[in-house]
A protein has these predicted regions:
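Conserved, mostly hydrophobic/aromatic
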Residues: 108
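Short, intrinsically disordered, charge-balanced linker/junction segments flanking boundaries
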Residues: 143-148
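Alpha/beta catalytic barrel-like cores
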Residues: 1-103, 113-116, 121-124, 135-142
Length: 148
């Protein structure tokens, strides 16, 4: 198995980190809204595209996508994001690269996802989070199996 979690990708300078988990605190989301979340998501998927290119270049065949690709995604629908067309384009492109170069992409839900919780709100949040993960893989046009 080949794993891919290098500290820095490509030849970008230190002041331009390549990362897929740009996020924000709740107060920032409340004040700046979905527009800012959309901007951060677009930057995250652009950098995911860069990471996949880097992985292909160096022969890495596995990458785990962060759960924070779309900050505060539980608070809005994908279709409400101003940058959704570009986000979908990048995700589709990433899916094509992953299939073409046999890069396995996975994700891992957060530690608070407990489908068996006795608390209805915990289960609801878990289902929402898992749905968001599925939406990302759907936008990449990857199969509904654990073998992407």
């Amino acid at each position: 198995m080949q794993l891919s979690y290098p500290k820095q990708y490509g030849n970008k300078p230190q002041d331009e980190p390549v990362t897929t988990n740009r996020s924000m605190i709740r107060r920032t989301f409340d004040s700046r809204g979905i527009e800012y979340a959309s901007e951060k998501t677009l930057l995250n998927v652009k950098d995911l595209d860069t990471i996949i290119d880097w992985n292909v270049m160096y022969g890495y065949k596995f990458f785990r996508i962060t759960s924070n690709l779309a900050p505060w995604k539980s608070e809005y629908d994908w279709t409400d994001m101003p940058d959704i067309k570009d986000i979908k384009w990048y995700l589709h492109s990433i899916g094509v690269k992953a299939r073409t170069h046999e890069v396995r992409l996975t994700s891992h839900p957060g530690p608070f996802n407990v489908l068996t919780s006795p608390h209805e709100h915990v289960v609801k949040n878990c289902v929402n989070d898992l749905t968001n993960h599925g939406d990302i893989f759907d936008m990449m046009n990857l199969s509904s199996t654990p073998y992407n």
